[in-house]
Every structure is written in C-alpha cells, then in structure tokens.
Regions:
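Extracytosolic secretory-pathway proteins
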Residues: 1-79, 83-176
Length: 176
C-alpha cells in the first residue's frame, strides 16, 4: 500500500455530457482549487489517500485498490436559482469502483459520502511512470444512479440517467 502525496485527477468531459448539461440549462462551475479548462477538462487536486497497484497479468482483481482523496474541491451545477455542489471526492477503485462525495444545495448539506459517480476500470490503460508520478488513464466515468435521482429531483427533470457518461479520467499520483 502506498500513501498518496498529491497531483491531480483530470476528467476529459464527454461531448454527450456537455450536451446534456446544455439541454438542461445547467451551468457547471468549480469549487475550491478545481479547474475547468476551455478544452473541457475538469481537474481536481489529489490531497491524500493510499493505493496499491497490482500487475494486470496477475489474478488479483481489481488490480487498483485503495482510496484517493480530493478534499476542498469539487463541481457545482446551477440552474433556476438552485446550486448543487458536489465536493470532497473520494475515489474507490476497488470492487464496485465509484466516486463518493458530499452534496450541498444552495450552501446547505444534503448528503455526506453520497455515491456520485460509477467507474468502469475495464477501459483503464496500464500504469505509466512520468517523473516522480504514476499515471492511470482511461477509466470511464458515469453519473451514478443515486446522483442522477438527486439531480433530477432538484432540477425537476428526468433527463439525467445513471448511464450518462461524464468522461475519461486520468489520475496523476505521487507517493509520500
């Protein structure tokens, strides 16, 4: 198990996700030190955690295990005078890979540790080394069923589904 020291999780947003936000008139924003580039890459700083990577040639599954923390940053979605904030993400790459986080509506806590995104690691490329960092790229990120229900209820729609593809993740991680 390796303690995670930092770097970033970047998600290249899928065109379908951006189109869905636009059709719902949802305005995305960032929280804390998260960024959203004009090229559609949403980036969150990694603040800690631990991770173990097993060679995919072995029988160990899932071959990435642990947790990766993103305290103090997140994503906001606004429309019709309502602002939903999804923040303090925790990536769990193990069995039933997902991202959990805290949910706020107009500044008030709604849910702590909600299952926000589902991860499909079957699309993950082999780990690469980049200087002092390890790069895990290719995991597909989807809106979770729980998050879809929450967003639909909040914004009065049924358009957000649990299979809505958010994008492709790239984690750049350093150890402590």
């Amino acid at each position: 198990m390796t303690s995670v020291g930092g770097k970033t999780t970047a998600i290249t947003l899928d065109a379908g996700f951006v189109k869905a936000l636009t059709s719902l008139k949802l305005t995305p924003g960032t929280i804390g030190s998260a960024t959203l580039s004009k090229a559609g890459v949403l980036t969150f700083p990694i603040t800690g955690g631990n991770v173990t990577y097993y060679d995919p040639a072995t029988k160990v599954r899932p071959y990435v295990q642990g947790e990766i923390d993103h305290s103090g940053s997140g994503l906001s979605l606004s429309a019709g005078g309502k602002k939903v904030e999804l923040k303090d993400f925790v990536i769990d790459p193990g069995n039933n890979s997902h991202v959990s986080g805290d949910v706020y509506l107009n500044g008030k806590s709604v849910v702590k540790g909600a299952n926000l995104f589902r991860l499909d690691g079957s699309t993950l490329n082999p780990v690469m080394k980049d200087g002092d960092a390890y790069v895990l790229e290719g995991t597909t990120v989807y809106v979770s069923t729980d998050a879809a229900a929450l967003l639909n209820k909040t914004f009065g729609t049924d358009a957000v589904t649990g299979d809505l593809k958010v994008g492709i993740a790239k984690l750049t991680v350093t150890g402590k």
